[in-house]
Amino acid sequence: PLHTVLYEDGAPAGLYCLKIQDFNIAGTALRVGGIGTVCVDGRSRGKGHLALLMQDAQERMQAAGCDIAMLGGQRQRYERFGYVPAGAHWEFTLTPRNVRDIRTGGVALAPLAEYPSWLESARALHEKQPVTCARGGDASFLTVLQSWRAEPYAVLQDGMFAGYCALAEGKPPRLQELVLPDAALLPAFAAALAQHTGAAGVRVQ
């Protein structure tokens, strides 16, 4: 990601981060520019700095050939720059009580980096999904899965690789990525996940 700082009289007055990623959505290649960490020093507000930051981001994305620009934030702030709501965010908490009558059925979690073959299988699985983002080779793929202080896990079925997930730190921990080719494993996975995280449960988003 590229961080850009706006200076006023030699002092930092604003900042934004731009990350450009290549996606494949149902066979269509799309370059997406993601904007984040947009902020202006409280002492410098009301001077048009936010508009300058957004204009700079727009120019950089156009120069990079981005097809889509996305960000998260207050609608009333960013609609002025042409951004509109474009999705829904679902979140819930899974606790051991929710799955107390479901057996793990031989499903378990193990650190993904434990065996190179698991990591290779996870990357191959990711690349087969209908919506993917270019993540590079195995080492880069693992680094991405570790974002937000996450621990990547292999999902095992009777000791064999069956999928992968990434569990981020938190109270409760957060399941931030899950790929299971066989949807029939979801109940057993939920039970194994609840068992792994303990009484705190897990936040799913």
Where do the language-model regions lie?
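Short loop/turn motifs at secondary-structure junctions and domain boundaries
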Residues: 1, 27-29, 143-149
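Conserved beta-strand in the GNAT
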Residues: 5, 11-21, 32-39, 154, ...
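Short coil/turn motifs at secondary-structure junctions
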Residues: 21-23, 43, 76
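Short loop/turn motifs at secondary-structure junctions
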Residues: 31-34, 65-67, 174, 197-200
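Conserved acetyl-CoA-binding loop-helix of GNAT-fold acetyltransferases
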Residues: 35-40, 46-59, 182-194
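Conserved active-site alpha-helix within GNAT-family acetyltransferase domains
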Residues: 63-67, 73-91
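Conserved hydrophobic beta-strand within the GNAT/NAT acetyltransferase core sheet
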Residues: 69-72, 202-204
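Amide-forming acyltransferase catalytic core, primarily the GNAT-like/NAT-type
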Residues: 85-197, 201-205
